[in-house]
Swiss-Prot record:
InterPro entries: Aldolase_TIM, BKACE. Its EC number is 2.3.1.318. Disulfide bonds: none annotated. This is 3-oxoadipate:acetyl-CoA acetyltransferase.
Length: 284
């Protein structure tokens, strides 16, 4: 059977504002509604940042708690993944929401240049975030911005800092970081298969490269990420009307490439996560 494709939706991010696209969900209710619609369109994993009311990035655990509660109610079974990225807090503040026990959390295993700053991930912070994820039984999604981050993730797994099979997200298209290049992506995938044969991976392209990365990921056996965090446009002329519209676009690509869109149960099994119910009870 052809492997199903997990569609991840990054609904908000830290950067897009309403002025960029009015559909960017900012409030708790907007984020819950946007996730529900994306879920109904085929997304089985939601990547979460939260915002303050003035649209600035936040790492406030209470806000994460309210979003997670709403998503678990209105998109039952969807894989919840919180961001520990550096725009919404400093140091250990970035992991303040991990005690809420989402299914997954992002973990960058090294530092990288971004358009106007360094995305700083010093080893002691990376180790602390990984330890918190392990303590709360949260599966990390390794954010790989270059090749070294794959090797670092494997080393952390071998040292017992990360449990279970790795899940890597290859991020391409951020200015000053790795550009979108199919040969590089293919080498990343080859390297990952050599170092961690049981690992899974997702491709994430930024802006106009979002669909290009989705196509390559489908061809190479990976999974796909979409959403207004990475790209506010449906095409060159059209703003995306919703996260659900972007998910539908990727779902159509899955059909084109003969990759069925993963169900919640399939996505959880592929990532080694608990099923929707444990002993007849919700895992939450």
């Amino acid at each position: 059977m052809t492997q199903p494709c997990i569609i991840s939706v990054a609904i908000t991010g830290s950067l897009p504002r309403k002025r960029d696209n009015p559909a960017v969900p900012i409030t708790v209710s907007e984020q819950v509604e946007s996730t529900q619609a994306a879920f109904e369109a085929g997304a089985t994993l939601v990547h979460l940042h939260v915002r303050n009311d003035d649209e600035t990035p936040s790492s406030e655990p209470d806000r994460f708690a309210r979003v997670l509660e709403g998503i678990r109610k209105h998109a039952p079974g969807i894989i919840t993944q919180v961001s520990t990225g550096g725009r919404s807090g400093a140091g250990r503040e970035r992991g303040g929401m991990l005690s809420l026990r989402p299914d997954m959390a992002s973990l960058a295993t090294g530092s990288v240049n971004f358009p106007t700053r360094v995305y700083d991930n010093p080893p002691d912070l990376v180790d602390w975030l990984a330890a918190e994820m392990k303590a709360y039984a949260i599966k990390p999604e390794i954010e790989a911005f270059d090749l070294s981050m794959i090797f670092q993730a494997v080393a952390m797994q071998q040292a017992g800092k990360i449990d279970g099979a790795l899940h890597i997200q290859f991020v391409m298209g951020i200015k000053n970081a790795m550009p979108v290049d199919r040969e590089v992506l293919a080498f990343y995938v080859h390297t990952l298969r050599r170092l961690a044969p049981d690992a899974t991976w997702t491709g994430a392209g930024i802006g106009r490269d979002q669909l290009t990365m989705a196509r390559w990921s489908l061809e190479l056996g990976g999974h796909c990420r979409t959403g207004l965090e990475d790209n506010v446009r449906l095409d060159k002329q059209t703003l995306a009307p919703s996260n659900a519209a972007l998910v539908s676009q990727v779902a159509a690509l899955c059909e084109e490439y003969g990759r069925p869109v993963a169900t919640v149960a399939q996505a959880r099994a592929l990532l080694g996560l608990p099923s929707m119910e444990i002993d007849g009870r919700s895992p939450w």
